[in-house]
């Protein structure tokens, strides 16, 4: 019944057993909790799990793991091995923050620990951080992406995803990037930072597929400040494909409110299932590479239809698989009526991260 959803697909030289993946998700879990969560999702039959926010630098968050050092590599190897043993492939979302980490550390030392206050300082400082970053630091970050990609290969990751939001997306954005050198201004210049990261990774790890998380912002109404405009998508897609990207994971750009990028059930604009697919539609116009769609996806019938109609080649879900890790197994078994459907309340997942409370799902 769901022959397209369950059909294998090849990304670069990597064959995935079906079209369903677990989206990169920050969960604030301890190592053993992460291993258990990812194992449960993998055992249900998803083809790919993308580990979100794999830092290219040491992290100051207690439960965050960096792939920049040996200790972090050993921890990631435990996760990767468990996912492989549970039947799924695994991708590392290489990530770099778009704020001055030292500034945030100093802010916290001054006693400012409120999440809202720190978030405001982070967001308010993005434009200056991007615009004034020295070229030596740009080159250093590009090298860190390359080194971390090599570490990911050594650990056993099957794919690399470049986090094209945050720092990379902010460099791509005409809102945040006001540089007047070769890294700012035109589409060609604003794509340069991402392009050099892609090229450096491709040169270092020639045999691992590169997925690009493509962040697109919307106008009228305005949502998102990082990323590129719909009118700029063609240029960026063709440029990145020419440099060796093997697939695109398409979503709304960040730096709007969290409830916009992870929309709740009562969002005024992103109400419907597949709410970000219109962004994937634009990317599909300009490439034959696999395109992964996201945004309130939960209905097997809906997902089957968008794959069969060539709107996307894959889907990536987070909240639905957190609500019911056996979603895909129930689809395979014809037990769709038994699926615990995500209600998109965000109460124990996205909201829990903001309040630093226990991550989970109200349906558990």
From Swiss-Prot:
Required co-factors: FMN; [4Fe-4S] cluster
E.C. number(s) listed in UniProt: 1.3.-.-
Biological process annotations from GO: porphyrin-containing compound catabolic process
Binding site for [4Fe-4S] cluster: 342, 345, 349, 361
PANTHER family on file: 2,4-DIENOYL-COA REDUCTASE, 2,4-DIENOYL-COA REDUCTASE [(2E)-ENOYL-COA-PRODUCING]
General remark: Bilirubin reductase is a key enzyme in the human gut microbiome. The enzyme is essential to human health, as excess serum bilirubin can cause jaundice and even neurological damage. BilR is nearly universally present in the gut microbiome of healthy adults, while the prevalence of the gene is much lower in patients with inflammatory bowel disease (IBD) and in infants, especially during the first few months of life when infants are most susceptible to developing jaundice.
UniProt similarity note: Belongs to the NADH:flavin oxidoreductase/NADH oxidase family.
Protein known as: Bilirubin reductase
Organism classification: Bacteria, Bacillati, Bacillota, Clostridia, Peptostreptococcales
